[in-house]
Amino acid sequence: MRPVAAEITTIDNRTSVGHSFWLSPRNGWQQQPAPGQFVMVALRRPPTGFGREVCDAVPMSVAGWEPGRLRLTVKDLGPTTKALLACRPGDTLTVTGPLGHGFSLDAQRPLLMGGGVGAPPLLFLAQQLAARGGEPVTLLGGATGDEIFHRDEFPGTVEIATDDGSAGHHGFITDLLDGRSPDRLYSCGPEPMLVKALAWALANGVPAELCLERYMACGVGLCGVCTIDRDLVCQDGPVLSSERLAQSAEFGKVVREAGGIVRHTPA
């Protein structure tokens, strides 16, 4: 998959912590994305103290698709995302993708659960499921109400949970799982949340597909830092099945950071 230069045509979904871009390349996208797939976005930043220009590439899940243009949602999480949020319509980004393995689209009574920046790829998924006759129910969680992206754009029923109680249920998003009986659970967000989602799915006999957020440097399987067990999240994922993750020795326990440094997460 070759990188393409894509122009920012529109900015929408503005919040205090981020917003969305619509991107259009001059010659069109090489391939239509599927929900759950991602792109690598490269951005050149001003020279460092050593006088060298910095070029960062970050993975970003696809939040929407229309013929000729693709949507990404960015949250301020560090220097690269802050630089992306400073871009304006007419600016150009270098984009590679779509990449990875996405969600299936066969559920009729799907339950979607997104935490933080896990909401954008689920918006794309919910729209695709609804277009196929599904009746999605979506659970969205965040630290505050202002950190819940796309809350008014999801088709079907939407329920909210916030850490501070500023919107919806005051507590964890996983508190909202009780009493549900979907034919499939789809989830994206922080790994501790996904661990709880997996446990609920296995305990209730609900097939699940979880979209992992792992550190990636290349997005094409060369660097290996997104490895989980023997799988590469950038190629075998980012969406992995509950059957696969139930057998994992590393899910929820081990992550790899920049340079491949292994970090064990609290149980």
Regions found by a protein language model. Name each.
Residues P79-A217:
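FNR/FR-type flavoprotein reductase catalytic core
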Residues R44-T48, T96-G102, G252-K253:
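Short, charged beta-turn/beta-strand-edge "cap" motif at the junction between a beta-strand
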Residues P121, E191-P192, E213-V239:
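Local cysteine-cluster metal-coordination motifs and their immediate loop/turn environment
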Residues T10, G64, I160-T162, L210, ...:
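Structural signal for conserved beta-strand scaffold positions within catalytic alpha/beta enzyme cores
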Residues M1-P89:
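Ferredoxin-reductase
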Residues D229-A267:
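Short Fe-S-cluster ligation motifs
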